[in-house]
């Protein structure tokens, strides 16, 4: 007798520079659909107009579909968080995994919408995740090589898919919010860093301050150090614009200049470290370099991750705004699909919605 799960979620897994992304695109009780008709599947053949085919496939709106991407993020958080917890928490997921929930586009000129999330909640944007999403959609036959625009809660992301592993995307306008912020940390003394926005909020610390070795053999020390700093930022009420939580801490160090301009270590919101160079973190770093006059418009910055993977960032445009100098980062990286699967949810499973943290 064939076993039929009571509920299911369809996903495509990929990694970008070692950091995994799970594209969550369909399922029973899908929050952005009135039925499963027209669902995205990896078996579909590309239509002559691939982008319009993608729009038709995911434009399955129901009465509950919020209009804007920020409203959709809020809806998922308050009304449909089961989709995140079932897909990303153990036993199906892990604290390393970033989710990308596919939605219809917000704007007529875009091809899709994505809400990023992880084991603790929702993200405004995710650079490595967007690269993984685009490569996944391409391998599913739902976009063609060339330009594509994906809407997110923090803005529309224009990108170009090479047709293979490489993606170049234009991130959101990024800026340094505060320079040389001194933070008194018990046991560590005074730690000085910059606060910057690159699609998420970061506290960035140079090697002259942290004096740590950024290598995989030093992970325990790096995690403890950055976790303590993040906790102290919250405890002391040091935040981004409009009181936004600084949920990423990023360390930088010099490296072999023939490979990259610097190496980083990034503590992510869920307590895991980023295996990739971190797209939003690289954008935040670029914003600081622009503010310091170290990178001009059109300038390049190569960022190496803790595992050795690299992103290239370009200061595509620089402008003077209300928040000071702002830079429009262009990022290039590579992603690879690692699996296409259907997650099964059995009503008899006590952990069918994931192993939930204590309330």
UniProtKB/Swiss-Prot annotation:
| Purpose | Catalyzes the epimerization of trans-4-hydroxy-L-proline (t4LHyp) to cis-4-hydroxy-D-proline (c4DHyp). Is likely involved in a degradation pathway that converts t4LHyp to alpha-ketoglutarate. Displays no proline racemase activity.
Q: Which domain of life is it from?
A: Bacteria
Where is substrate annotated to bind?
127-128, 248, 274, 279-280
Q: Which family does it belong to?
A: Belongs to the proline racemase family.
Q: What is its EC number?
A: 5.1.1.8
Give one Pfam family, short name only.
Answer: Pro_racemase
Tell me what reaction this enzyme catalyses. trans-4-hydroxy-L-proline = cis-4-hydroxy-D-proline
Query: What lineage is on file?
Result: Bacteria, Pseudomonadati, Planctomycetota, Planctomycetia, Planctomycetales
Record protein name field: 4-hydroxyproline 2-epimerase
Question: Which SUPFAM superfamilies has this protein been placed in?
Answer: Diaminopimelate epimerase-like
